[in-house]
Amino acid sequence: MKTFNANCLLLVSLLLILASCVIPESNHVRPTYHLLSELGAEGNESLPPGEVSFYVSQVELPTYLQDSRLVSRPSEGLIEFRENDRWGEPLEEGIARVLGLNLGRRLNTFSYSVYPHRKKVSCMYDLGITVQRFERIDSESILLEAICEIHFSKKVNQVRFVKKIELASAGNGEKSANQDVRALSQAIDEFCGFLALRISSSAAGDPDD
């Protein structure tokens, strides 16, 4: 009888040990990583190739945009971070990269560099970008607000840019993070068009610039 009880106790102990080794199914969802992209802006053929050179210095962001997670601000004073959608590079570097690509194409030049790379020698324009808003603001749109200081020929011209873009719906009618990122890329492209006009006018000697 004692042997039977001992065997039962041993069997129960083994079952408990095996049960403790079972790994529960994970609820972890791997995040999706996103990159801002160039949208193929048209070049300015009125400018000779390489006529303009520029440098995009380190983009300044508010603290909440320095997080790797995509951000939404559905109402004033409320921020929502998306755990499963993240930037694939530091956001300030991604914005500078796409600014350089789009602005270089619009100004018909390869003579540019962007942070974190060093400024090229004899650079004509130094652009200091401060981004104040860069996120989805409701279920239908994103918002870009930025200030740019254009340093040229010992002068500084400060300009402000605001752009709201409606989101395109996915096939099922929902607004996904991919639509957000594409709309944010479009906002940067339009910001570059705005800056290119300013730079082109100063390069042409516009007296009002």
Residue ranges with predicted function:
Residues 1-10:
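Bacterial N-terminal signal peptides that target proteins for export
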Residues 23-43, 50, 106-156, 173-174:
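Surface-exposed short loop/turn segments
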